């Protein structure tokens, strides 16, 4: 009920800011509002506390709704940057592997509990192979991490979303594991500590914030900066690595696409392929990424003499 009340409050705020009078229409759409009667009823009751609204169902949804709406327009909307119809045969850029749907296998929502577990286990089976294919690049970074730590330098992990959380996780595990101070391996996430628990949309799209957050720690030639971006294109990470290069720090990119847009001294491109839930890189991509971070921190600490 708390989440339904929160959604109702947000709906009421939007209606007020749009200047809508009582009796405005609220179209019920989405998994919870359509398939969870108790949630939908709680939402209606909570919204009624703020204002009077008409609750409607959608005659059309998704692409069909957008197409039908577009046909009613007689001019290009001011906010539209491009308005065109593609000719037959037009080719569009391919989605990155992590965003595609697997070529074979059942849809996740068609399976029962045992089927979901079996499918996810089978899909994760290739994760180790994806990491093994990058063994030489990982070993190079482990050696560099060892030299940096032995010389008194620091390792920085920087990323957004799941990638940022994995970096912060690995960094936070180093003090209790190796007996080092928290400033030897530092995790930085777009949006700060709040983003560890709550999604902050838009922060990952600001390269200047990546540079700013890294600059706050005065990273320099004696440090190692590891950018983490499953897509290989996160602007926040690109900005951080650009700042690191300008400061003279060696840079590493850990990604899950074959041709990342971000440049780094060493690129670890993990071929994890499509996720069982398309686009959800907290799954296979996240598993492979954490394996690499484990190797960098554990291997680096070992070479620097913290394991005996």
Task: Give the positions of each predicted feature.
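Short helix-loop-beta connector
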Residues: 20-22, 151-152, 219-222
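Short glycine/proline- and acidic residue-enriched helix-loop micro-motifs
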Residues: 124-129
